[in-house]
């Protein structure tokens, strides 16, 4: 039966793809690690530097608005959200984590565009530092794979 099913294989070729990145500046060292890993992976996947737009914002709560603006422009095949929310001693962590995550997801669904979410939510700086390189690269791969899948499915 599987032989009769049309299977769409993952496509990690970034050639010709336009990628928009919204990056929070709060927790700067972690965000820079995410950014550097994401850009390095996009380059490995064949995305040209001139096809990448990077916009920075104050914090994670501002990321969805910039993603929405990028999505509305119609200039991008996929978007990437980068940021770091590290738990403190107040309820603010939950608020920022939940709202930024929901906003990022909503942009993708509302504007029919793939969005890779690499806004880290961690208990401490050490966890963020361990995850930043892996998750930055993951976000790049997700953006490229989903952009290609999206194009294939849309015909």
Curated annotation (Swiss-Prot):
Keywords: Riboflavin biosynthesis, Transferase. InterPro entries: LS, LS/RS, LS/RS_sf. GO terms for cellular component: cytosol; riboflavin synthase complex. The active site is at residue 92. Signal peptide: none annotated. It catalyses: (2S)-2-hydroxy-3-oxobutyl phosphate + 5-amino-6-(D-ribitylamino)uracil = 6,7-dimethyl-8-(1-D-ribityl)lumazine + phosphate + 2 H2O + H(+). The keyword Transferase applies. Pathway: Cofactor biosynthesis; riboflavin biosynthesis; riboflavin from 2-hydroxy-3-oxobutyl phosphate and 5-amino-6-(D-ribitylamino)uracil: step 1/2. Its EC number is 2.5.1.78. One of its GO terms (molecular function) is 6,7-dimethyl-8-ribityllumazine synthase activity. (2S)-2-hydroxy-3-oxobutyl phosphate binds at residues 89-90, 131. CDD domains: Lumazine_synthase-I (cd09209). GO terms for biological process: riboflavin biosynthetic process. 5-amino-6-(D-ribitylamino)uracil binds at residues 26, 60-62, 84-86, 117. The keyword Magnesium does not apply. Catalyzes the formation of 6,7-dimethyl-8-ribityllumazine by condensation of 5-amino-6-(D-ribitylamino)uracil with 3,4-dihydroxy-2-butanone 4-phosphate. This is the penultimate step in the biosynthesis of riboflavin. This is 6,7-dimethyl-8-ribityllumazine synthase. The gene is ribH.
């Amino acid at each position: 039966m599987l032989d009769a099913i049309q299977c769409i294989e993952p496509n990690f070729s970034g050639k010709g793809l336009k990628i928009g990145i919204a990056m929070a500046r709060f927790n700067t060292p972690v965000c820079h690690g995410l950014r550097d890993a994401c850009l390095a992976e996009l380059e490995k996947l064949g995305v040209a530097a001139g096809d990448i737009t990077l916009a920075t914002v104050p914090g994670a709560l501002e990321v969805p608005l910039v993603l929405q603006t990028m999505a509305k422009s119609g200039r991008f095949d996929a978007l990437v959200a980068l940021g770091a929310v590290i738990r403190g001693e107040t309820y603010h962590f939950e608020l920022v984590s939940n709202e930024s995550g929901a906003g990022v997801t909503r942009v993708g669904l509302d504007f029919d565009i793939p969005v890779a979410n690499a806004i880290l939510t961690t208990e401490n700086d050490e966890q963020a530092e361990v995850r930043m390189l892996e998750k930055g690269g993951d976000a790049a791969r997700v953006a490229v794979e989903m952009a290609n899948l999206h194009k294939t499915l849309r015909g």
